[in-house]
Swiss-Prot record:
Involved in the maturation of [NiFe] hydrogenases. Required for nickel insertion into the metal center of the hydrogenase. Keywords: Metal-binding, Nickel, Zinc. Belongs to the HypA/HybF family. It holds the Pfam family HypA. PANTHER family: HYDROGENASE MATURATION FACTOR HYPA. The gene is hypA. GO terms for molecular function: nickel cation binding; zinc ion binding. This is Hydrogenase maturation factor HypA. The keyword Transmembrane does not apply. Zn(2+) binds at residues 73, 76, 89, 92.
Length: 119
């Protein structure tokens, strides 16, 4: 399960950014995952729940946005979404397409409560 190592790095980044912002705690993390990123949301959530204990990210809500896969034909330049004929260009019927979107996995935003807010 590679989600464990992915989530460990994700948490390190989140905690570092939150501490840099002098946050009291992290309340929400918005993540973007491409259709072909190979990341399982439920596994990331489970790993995050366990790994974030005793950190300022404990209890934070993870929100996921999905980016659909998109391809570009290397023969004619046409861009197209994934479909039944995965890598076949619908324009020229060529079999030489590259993925131009859908492999992403990144933190879009982190919502925090800062130290200046009273308890």
């Amino acid at each position: 399960m590679h989600e464990l190592s992915i989530t460990e790095e994700l948490l390190k980044t989140i905690v570092a950014k939150a501490e840099e912002a002098k946050a009291r705690n992290v309340s929400r993390i918005n993540l973007v995952i491409g259709e072909y990123a190979g990341v399982v949301e439920d596994s990331v959530k489970m790993c995050f729940e366990i790994l974030s204990q005793d950190t300022i990210a404990n209890g934070a809500i993870l929100e996921f946005s999905r980016i659909p896969a998109k391809f570009r034909c290397r023969l004619c330049g046409h861009t197209f979404p994934s479909g039944q004929n995965l890598l076949v260009c619908p324009e020229c019927q060529g079999w030489n397409a590259e993925v131009i979107a859908g492999n992403e996995f990144f933190i879009e935003s982190i919502e925090v409560d800062d130290e200046s807010q009273s308890s």
